[in-house]
Structures are given as C-alpha cells and as structure tokens.
Amino acid sequence: IYYKNLNVVHYVFLILWLAHYIHRTFIYPFMVDMENQKMPISIPISAMSFNFINVSIQFYGIFLSGEYSYQWFMNPYFCIGIGLFISGMYINIRSDYYMISLRKTRGPGYHQPNSFLYKYISSPNYFGEMIEWLGWAILTASSAGLIFFFWTVANLFPRAIAHHKWYKLSLIHISEPTRRI
C-alpha cells in the first residue's frame, strides 16, 4: 500500500491491523473444528458490511487525515496503546486456542475452561479483543480508533454477558465463585 502522505508510523499501524485480521481471517477459522458449519447468510453479509464501513472510517481517519511524525513512537499514547494492543491480542488468541485445545484433547462438545484467565472471567477472548481495540484507539489517538473500540464493546460486551449467564443457567458448574463476566 502506497500513499504519498504515509510514513513509518502509518505502516506500524497497518502491520498491527493486518496481524489481527490475517490471524482472524486466514489462521483461526482453520484451527476451529466447527460442529455445525451452517450459518444464516445474514451473518457473513453483516460482517462484510461492518468491515467495509469500519475500514473506510479507519482509513480516512488514520491514514488519510491522521498526521503522525516519527516522534509519535515516543508519545505515551503510542507506548501505552501498543502495549495494550499486543496484550489484548495475546489474551484473545491464547484464550481461543485454549478452548480449541480442550475440544481436541477431550473430544467434541463443550468443556468448562478453568485455566489462564478463564479462572477469573467467563469470556477472556472477548475481554482480550476489547483490550486490543482500546489499545488501537489510544495508540492512534484518533476518533476513528475510538469509534472502532466502542463498536467492539457494543458487539462483544453483550455477548460476554450472555455467555456468563449461560454458564450460570447451564449444567456447567463454575468452580471458581469469583469468575466474572
């Protein structure tokens, strides 16, 4: 990708963005053994529509309108944001792969996770992704990044609540009484 106003800071942003989406699009789906591979057509259409709108906002807000000098790498926003982004991505990926490993070692069906952050919260994968995009909003210090963070929370937090309620209502016993949403 070449655009005359882009500099190395923009390319670092692009690498982080692509790292998330390459993993989410081309690696993770092939690691998951889906029991029911059918889904309503509205789900991929909604996902593609969201991503088209979001990429447009991010591209305009960060890559076309955002002005970042080389000194941005020393800015506390960048340092804190990249730390959160990488930490959130790690939490997200590790949580997902922990669930995958449970299915591979214990067979099909649901198995209660009780390791890593699953000891404390019901959906650390969602938590990690929210932290990741909070980091994005901070490291880009942009309204576009903030919009994406709010969209992520609006999507994932209700799902985390529903997942936690499912834990409580299902036959699965939560052995950690301090586990939170």
Where in this protein do the model-derived segments appear?
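Membrane-interface transmembrane-helix boundary segments in multi-pass integral membrane proteins
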Residues: K119-Y126, A141-A154
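Transmembrane alpha-helical segments that form the membrane-embedded catalytic/substrate-channel core
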Residues: Y21-F30, F52-G61, L84-L102, T152-Y167
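Flexible extramembrane linkers and terminal tails adjacent to transmembrane helices
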Residues: Q37, Q71-M74, F78, R103-Q112
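Solvent-exposed interhelical
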Residues: T105-M130
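Membrane-helix and juxtamembrane interface regions of eukaryotic multi-pass membrane proteins
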Residues: I1-F50, F78-I80, L84, F149
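Single conserved hydrophobic/aromatic residue that forms the stacking wall/gate
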Residues: I172-I181
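Helix-coil boundary and interhelical linker segments in multi-pass alpha-helical membrane proteins
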Residues: I1-I15, V55-C79, A137-I147
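Core segments of transmembrane alpha-helices
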Residues: I1, S46-F59, N92, N125-W133
